[in-house]
From Swiss-Prot:
GO CC annotations, alphabetized: chloroplast thylakoid membrane; photosystem II
InterPro entries documented for this protein: D1/D2, Photo_II_D1/D2_sf, Photo_RC_L/M, Photo_RC_L/M_CS, PSII_D1
Positions bearing the site annotation: Tyrosine radical intermediate: 164
Residues marked Stabilizes free radical intermediate (site): 193
A GO BP entry: photosynthetic electron transport in photosystem II
Miscellaneous field: 2 of the reaction center chlorophylls (ChlD1 and ChlD2) are entirely coordinated by water. Herbicides such as atrazine, BNT, diuron or ioxynil bind in the Q(B) binding site and block subsequent electron transfer.
Keywords: Calcium, Chlorophyll, Chloroplast, Chromophore, Electron transport, Herbicide resistance, Iron, Magnesium, Manganese, Membrane, Metal-binding, Oxidoreductase, Photosynthesis, Photosystem II, Plastid, Thylakoid, Transmembrane, Transmembrane helix, Transport
Species annotation: Karenia mikimotoi
Cofactor: how and how many bound: The D1/D2 heterodimer binds P680, chlorophylls that are the primary electron donor of PSII, and subsequent electron acceptors. It shares a non-heme iron and each subunit binds pheophytin, quinone, additional chlorophylls, carotenoids and lipids. D1 provides most of the ligands for the Mn4-Ca-O5 cluster of the oxygen-evolving complex (OEC). There is also a Cl(-1) ion associated with D1 and D2, which is required for oxygen evolution. The PSII complex binds additional chlorophylls, carotenoids and specific lipids.
Record's protein name: Photosystem II protein D1
Root EC class: oxidoreductase
SUPFAM superfamilies xrefs: Bacterial photosystem II reaction centre, L and M subunits
């Protein structure tokens, strides 16, 4: 009797589990969920709701750990531009700070626990989205290049939100989740690490602006060389079908136009090589930028040319590097002005003596 009941129970549960597995992994649904999606949906939903609530109503956060809280929510005198989810307090360092680690909810909010909640759930969510792209490509029999391409922004987000705060020893050094907070993070990053003079950042700039240029060039060339398959009074869109085997544009005509516009070997005559280049250029550049931020997280900073060129009378002839250094010092003085009086560069007596001729 006991074995009969167990067999009936197993027969009732197995079909339901198999139905759930087939529903999760099927590619026939309007939106593919996948096993990674089972992790992506709750984490991204949690991060989104926590961010919205924190941006609207979070109390001020003691970001510097000196009992001088900074407000970031709309209910505390901020607007869309100045509002942000403030990073966790410097008093927390890189400690994991969930709600149950605080004595009360007020203490958790005061120490910026909202920031860790949003960032960690967001990080898990985007990594799950990355895995979901691979999973869908695998089930459709596609190559995994979409997954590889999306790894670039995931690497950049990981460098800014995870690697850099850990390298600096505190999540208070992470990027605030807001518009003005992002710009503040960029200025402070330049002041402390001289990122503009870092070769890996230069690759990233070339990737972003170059990728935008190549995308605009490719899109305009394709649109200008579409093969017309309809009559004059019909829309050109009626001549194409999704998934058709024939080309929709004349790559030879586009190649000839661009070759005559610049020079012959400046354009691609192979569609696969062209699109691989369009995908690889920005992806590799963003990878290198993420590597640069990760190295600067451990203070392997950009190139710094400290020695000025002196004329015959001993007066310095300032170069662009000197102007950049002076700007960095100014930005660093304004950063955390209540936490310390001077940045480390100005707290050194030798540095002050070396800067004295420039001041004079």
């Amino acid at each position: 009797m006991k074995s009969t009941l167990l067999n009936k129970k197993s027969q009732q549960t197995t079909p339901a589990w198999e139905f759930f597995c087939s529903w999760v992994t099927t590619t026939e649904n309007r939106l593919y969920l996948g096993w990674f999606g089972c992790l992506m949906v709750p984490t991204l939903v949690s991060a989104t709701f926590a961010y919205i609530i924190g941006f609207l109503a979070a109390p001020p956060v003691d970001i510097d750990g000196i009992r001088e809280p900074v407000s970031g929510s709309l209910l505390y005198a901020n607007n869309i531009i100045s509002g942000a989810v403030i990073p966790s307090s410097n008093a927390m360092g890189v400690h994991f700070y969930p709600i149950w680690e605080a004595a009360s909810l007020d203490e958790w909010l005061y120490n910026g626990g909202t920031y860790q909640l949003v960032v960690f759930h967001f990080f898990i969510g985007v990594c799950s989205y990355l895995g979901r792209e691979w999973e869908l490509s695998y089930r459709l029999g596609m190559r995994p290049w979409i997954f590889v391409a999306f790894s670039a922004p995931v690497a950049a987000a990981s460098a800014v939100f995870i690697v850099y705060p850990i390298g600096q020893g505190s999540f208070s050094d992470g990027m605030p989740l807001g518009i003005s907070g992002t710009f503040n993070f960029m200025l402070v990053f330049q002041a402390e690490h001289n990122i503009l003079m870092h070769p890996l950042h230069m690759f990233g700039v070339a990737a972003v602006f170059g990728g935008s240029l190549f995308s605009a060039m490719h899109g305009s060339l394709v649109t200008s060389s579409l093969l017309k398959e309809t009559a004059e009074f019909e829309s050109a869109n009626y001549g194409y079908r999704f998934g058709q085997s024939t080309e929709t544009y004349n790559i030879v005509a586009a190649h000839g136009y661009f070759g005559r516009l610049i020079f012959q070997y400046a354009s691609f005559n192979n569609s696969r090589s062209l699109h691989f280049f369009l995908g690889a250029w920005p992806v590799v550049g963003i990878w290198l930028t993420a590597m640069g931020v990760s190295t600067m997280a451990f203070n392997l900073n950009g190139l710094n040319f400290q020695q000025s060129i002196l004329d015959a009378s001993g007066c310095p002839i300032n170069t662009w590097a000197d102007i950049l250094n002076r700007a960095n010092l100014g930005m660093e003085v304004m950063h955390e002005r209540n936490a310390h009086n001077f940045p480390l560069d100005l707290a050194c007596a030798n540095c002050l003596l070396s800067l004295w001729p420039m001041v004079g």
